[in-house]
């Protein structure tokens, strides 16, 4: 089978499409024929060495497809089931072995492409809006990269929970996408200072929560956008990691809260995994949440998908199609 492998850390050019043996499922494992795999910043961080992984390895932590084989002791699924998963390396391939307890059943109304697009980013948007800072009517949130994969989903979920949404984007075209996803106000950060705009839009009060996946270039100004006792949720670092930080600043700016969450912590148990994935997939099934596929690439063009993602030229979700 074909798989995208990493032998040395570096830029997108280190990604190599290789012929490898098809894996066999061991005890508690399932063999999944991949229909679509999601492309995420965590893949970039593992490729460039920011998140160390023993090499060589097959990239990718999110996919959807069909069960084609099961190992001893598997009770959760059977051959022929449509499934999706996240948090298991090896998705940039034609087949992958996955622990059965990490699989999520796909409703008939949800396509494999939608399933692959929703696992990491959909569950991320869900835990951000429902658990990390549970949005409620009367809250105002600031969503950076509001036209990105997580951003578009987060805007929609925030509106489902009754919050006011202020989004930041880089272009007018992305602003339209964010508005279509429910953003009440959209700031073009390339033309206006987002901190000043947030203060203006909130009458100087600030927002209850900032959802920041950008990191280095937005973090400090984002703290200034928060109301007293507001929460900075730093869940990514697309522009680079945030530098050394003195917690005393949180007190000085109004007894602020700061968290650096990761989706795998929020789906550590099968109960949580099924609950979060089930809610997200249910919203899609019922037409309450829309998934935007921003681009599809064959495995041989995985490097191009990474270049698009890193250049922030994407809107919605990028997929690899084996």
What are these regions, as identified by a protein language model?
Residues 169, 217-288, 321-322:
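Glycine-rich phosphate-binding loop and adjacent beta-alpha segment
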Residues 159-218, 269-273:
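Adenosine-nucleotide cofactor-binding segment
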Residues 82, 140, 164, 230-231, ...:
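Short glycine-centered segments of the SAM/dcSAM-binding site in methyltransferase folds
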Residues 21-38, 48-90:
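Glycine-rich beta-strand-centered segment in the early N-terminal region that forms part
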Residues 150:
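Hydrophobic/small residue at the entry helix of a nucleotide-binding pocket
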Residues 286-295, 303-322:
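C-terminal capping/lid region of NAD(P)-dependent oxidoreductase domains
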Residues 36, 45, 82-147:
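NAD(P)H dinucleotide-binding glycine-rich loop of Rossmann-like/cofactor-binding domains
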